[in-house]
Amino acid sequence: MAERAPAPGGLALIETLVNTLDLESGVDSLDTDPARAALGLVDASAAELADARELRESLRAVCLVHGGHPPVPATPLDRLLAAAPLVVTVDPDGSAALRPVDPGSLVARVAAAIAAAAADGTWPRLKACEAADCHWAYYDRSPAGRSRWCSMAVCGSRAKMRAYRAARRT
């Protein structure tokens, strides 16, 4: 599941957050200190961790849509992001960016990352693996942007083997 290079820029934060839950094993690494530290949630309360999990699953739903799944009718993503104040900053070189008012806020950092990725066209390339028992987030670097699995060696191979066996049965 982790054979790909990390997503570029702020998308790496989103990829890391989505991948804190391993659907196959059921392990939620938000229950561990290292994963919380990587996301800036070291001293997070139970409510903040619940919000992080809600954010994670809302982002996973969007990544699945990026991969070609039908849109989910409603996720709390808009509501979560609306609570993340951002400010426009202009660097000395004249470049502008949206930055979190509170850089310690995970939701604000995610909102800024989404805004930057949407502006540079990379947001739709953050996808979730098509395999139902995986849904691992990955950045699609394929030229056509039509990658379907987090790993051709694991999830892609399993899907192709299932398709082959199904075709042989008919």
Name every feature range the model reports, one short phrase each.
Residues 1-128, 132-135, 139:
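Short helix-coil boundary/hinge micro-motifs
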Residues 18, 33, 144, 165-170:
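Hydrophobic alpha-helical segments
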Residues 126-131, 147, 152, 158:
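Residues immediately within or flanking Cys/His clusters that coordinate Zn2+
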Residues 140-147:
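Short linker/helix segments within small regulatory modules
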Residues 153-169:
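Basic DNA-binding region of bZIP-type proteins
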